[in-house]
């Protein structure tokens, strides 16, 4: 066997292995960027020796074989994938190839859209009624996922409108918004269930459940982007026209679709989407660029596995491989001990990453991680980098186990793990320097007491020099004492003292949030403040009374009750009030006297609003007698769903709670 034949055989074997892990097992071992590199290497070798191309080469087909647990559906029109480009030069070369093949000097009109990172599916409608749905599978045969697709509320079971074809197969992507993904993993960590590496794996795992009732509980959604079968009807003769027609029939289509009349316009679209990527609310890994004219698409045709008239312009990889050099343990404000992987520095999505969170001991066990392992690191948007999985096939010989501490790495106190919780905590409380620092940083933060100019480095020095032990000590600081800190001159010191004085005037809700009670976020603090009205009433509340507050269950109620039962916490509150911390007396709202559809209702906001900020919406709802909660429960009366609403919307639908959109909210606010 020639050396090049050996290379081809090894590359094909490696790619098939990773295709199986990705498409069939939903458990990829390497990042997409590494797979793309291997595929490019195979293509280049096959281009050198086309006589060695085999029919079963990964370059000659789309994906991997379907699972046998599902019935199979044969695609009447093959579901092809797209070729990729990774930089401007490659895209411009693709643009030139298209123009050369069309023998045209005029610019091609491109239709540009998002490259969603989910699971490709085909959905067949007959006379407007959904009759079947399938995964891509190997491009020729997919898995029958009809029962599961029917549970996705974004997908209409019946199309509406005129001139619907007798048989219409639409193609698109099923995906999981980031909020839904985080909620699924949060629940899994709490219950010991399967934790997904990323939203794409979670979407695939949710869609390919044998029990559709499980799929129905997952907040999956869908965007349509193409067509397969078309019989007994007509569609517009442009790609954008078809998308608009699909939308008119009730199929969801992304609103980020743009026509570009030049290569430069395409590059501008790419850059704008890349910039907006962290705020979309769902994962994408590039943009898709298609010739808009169907006539030109037909003229350009296909190669073995992809159309010549479209390409995926991928973003820099959000996943990379590197090595874990060590694991250190950090202590948070509630005593939670978090393992952090110290990595061989690696560029991920344009950022040099040298640390990644490992969450807790259960996560380390789930990953099977050892110090010295080669791992896949993921960084998406502003999310803290995390270890996705261990590359077991490349585990070095010299690795060592990760030993979770039995004593706090900062203060030496015992650690404990409460039964049913995933988190291990230091029991030292405020004698622990780490907990003290983090508690004080939380107390002065913008959403809490909002002490302008008091950053983390100042807090670190104040604790290390023993100037401050409790939040009340902050208000006793003088400009003279602050001037002794590093990089703190007289003017800066006086500014901090002035900011502390200004921060004394706050709100009851901000004060509660600043105290750092476990499980009490901003929304819960607002709910407690609105329900009890005064600190005295809240401190006297029983666990049963606390549970009457929207968004407060037994766990939160117990944490609040225990916080106020602790004498040292009550002492700190007394000291804070003695130092002049105050807030306005509560305004008593008699909801029975308010003529508003929101009066007396428990309302939850989810998704992003376009007409007003979330804070403005909350304020207007509260002014009209509503109680605004942070999560959906049986106590919820109404959910207001903005764009990219995730798990809260899904739970509301599951519980049969009334849901309205932003436009309806604005109409009712003015009613």
Swiss-Prot record:
PANTHER family: CHROMOSOME TRANSMISSION FIDELITY FACTOR 18 (PTHR23389), DNA LIGASE (PTHR23389:SF9). GO terms for molecular function: DNA binding; DNA ligase (NAD+) activity; metal ion binding. NAD(+) binds at residues 32-36, 81-82, 113, 136, 173, 290, 314. Keywords: DNA damage, DNA repair, DNA replication, Ligase, Magnesium, Manganese, Metal-binding, NAD, Zinc. It is an enzyme of class 6 (ligase). HAMAP family: DNA_ligase_A. InterPro entries: BRCT_dom, BRCT_dom_sf, DisA/LigA_HHH, DNA_ligase, DNA_ligase_AS, DNA_ligase_CS, DNAligase_adenylation, DNAligase_N. One of its GO terms (biological process) is DNA repair. Its cofactor is Mg(2+); Mn(2+). It comes from Salmonella choleraesuis (strain SC-B67). The active site is at 115 (n6-amp-lysine intermediate). It comes from the Bacteria. Zn(2+) binds at residues 408, 411, 426, 432. It catalyses: NAD(+) + (deoxyribonucleotide)n-3'-hydroxyl + 5'-phospho-(deoxyribonucleotide)m = (deoxyribonucleotide)n+m + AMP + beta-nicotinamide D-nucleotide. The gene is ligA. DNA ligase that catalyzes the formation of phosphodiester linkages between 5'-phosphoryl and 3'-hydroxyl groups in double-stranded DNA using NAD as a coenzyme and as the energy source for the reaction. It is essential for DNA replication and repair of damaged DNA. NCBIfam families: dnlj, PRK07956.1. Belongs to the NAD-dependent DNA ligase family. LigA subfamily. One of its GO terms (cellular component) is cytosol. This is DNA ligase. Its EC number is 6.5.1.2. Residues 593-671 form the BRCT domain.
């Amino acid at each position: 066997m020639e050396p090049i034949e050996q290379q081809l055989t090894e590359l094909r074997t490696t790619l098939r292995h990773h295709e199986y892990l990705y498409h069939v097992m939903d458990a990829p071992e390497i990042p997409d960027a590494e797979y793309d590199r291997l595929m490019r290497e195979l293509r280049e070798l096959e281009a050198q020796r086309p006589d060695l191309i085999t029919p079963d080469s990964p370059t000659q087909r789309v994906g991997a074989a379907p699972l046998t647990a599902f019935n199979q559906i044969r695609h009447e029109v093959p579901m092809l994938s797209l070729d990729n480009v990774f930089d401007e030069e490659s895209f411009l070369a693709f643009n030139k190839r298209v123009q050369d093949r069309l023998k045209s000097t005029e610019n091609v009109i491109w239709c540009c859209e998002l490259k969603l990172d989910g699971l490709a599916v085909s959905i067949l409608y007959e006379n407007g009624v959904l009759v079947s749905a399938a995964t891509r599978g190997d491009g020729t045969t997919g898995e029958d996922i009809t029962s599961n697709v029917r549970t996705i509320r974004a997908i209409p079971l019946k199309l509406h409108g005129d001139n619907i074809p007798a048989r219409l197969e639409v193609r698109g992507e099923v995906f999981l918004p980031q909020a839904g993904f985080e909620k699924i993993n949060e629940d899994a960590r709490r219950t010991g269930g399967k934790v997904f590496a990323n939203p794409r794996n979670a979407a695939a795992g949710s869609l390919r459940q044998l029990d559709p009732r499980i799929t129905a509980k997952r907040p999956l959604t869908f965007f349509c982007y193409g067509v397969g079968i078309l019989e007994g009807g007509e569609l517009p003769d442009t790609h954008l026209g078809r998308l608009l027609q699909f939308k008119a029939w009730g199929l969801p289509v992304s609103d980020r679709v743009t026509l570009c009349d030049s290569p430069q316009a395409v590059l501008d679209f790419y850059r704008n989407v890349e910039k907006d990527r962290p705020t979309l609310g769902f994962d994408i890994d590039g943009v898709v660029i298609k010739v808009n004219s169907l006539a030109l698409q037909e003229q350009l045709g296909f190669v073995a596995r992809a159309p010549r008239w479209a390409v995926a312009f991928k973003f820099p990889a959000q996943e990379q491989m590197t090595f874990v050099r060590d694991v250190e343990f950090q202590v948070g404000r509630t005593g939670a001990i978090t393992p952090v992987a110290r990595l061989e520095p690696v560029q991920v999505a344009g950022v040099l990453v040298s640390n990644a969170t490992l969450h807790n001991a259960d996560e380390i066990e789930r990953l099977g991680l050892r110090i010295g392992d080669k791992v896949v690191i993921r960084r998406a948007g502003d999310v803290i980098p995390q270890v996705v999985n261990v590359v077991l096939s490349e585990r070095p010989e010299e690795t060592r186990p990760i030993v979770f501490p039995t004593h706090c790495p900062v203060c030496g106190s015992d650690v404990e793990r409460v039964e049913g919780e995933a988190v291990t905590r230091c029991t030292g409380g405020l004698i622990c320097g780490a907990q003290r620092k983090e508690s004080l940083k939380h107390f002065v933060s913008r959403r809490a007491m909002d002490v302008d100019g008091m950053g983390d480095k100042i807090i670190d020095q104040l604790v290390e020099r023993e100037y401050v032990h409790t939040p009340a000590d902050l208000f006793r600081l003088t400009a003279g004492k602050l001037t002794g800190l590093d990089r703190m001159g007289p003017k800066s010191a006086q500014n901090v003292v002035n900011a502390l004085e200004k921060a004394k005037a706050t709100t009851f809700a901000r004060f509660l949030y600043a105290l750092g009670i476990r499980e009490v976020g901003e929304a819960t603090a607002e709910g407690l403040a609105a329900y009890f009205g005064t600190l005295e009433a809240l401190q006297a509340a029983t666990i049963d009374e606390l549970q009457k507050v929207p968004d407060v269950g037994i766990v939160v109620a117990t944490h609040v009750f225990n916080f106020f039962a602790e004498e040292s916490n009550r002492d700190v509150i007394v000291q804070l009030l003695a130092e002049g911390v105050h807030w306005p007396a509560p305004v008593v709202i008699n909801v029975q006297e308010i003529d508003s559809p929101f009066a007396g209702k428990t309302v939850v906001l989810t998704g992003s609003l376009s007409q007003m900020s979330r804070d403005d919406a909350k304020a207007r709802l509260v002014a009209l007698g509503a109680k605004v909660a942070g999560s959906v429960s049986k106590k919820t009366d109404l959910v207001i769903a903005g764009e990219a609403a995730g798990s809260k919307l899904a739970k509301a639908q599951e519980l049969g709670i009334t849901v309205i959109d932003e436009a309806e909210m604005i109409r009712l606010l003015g009613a």
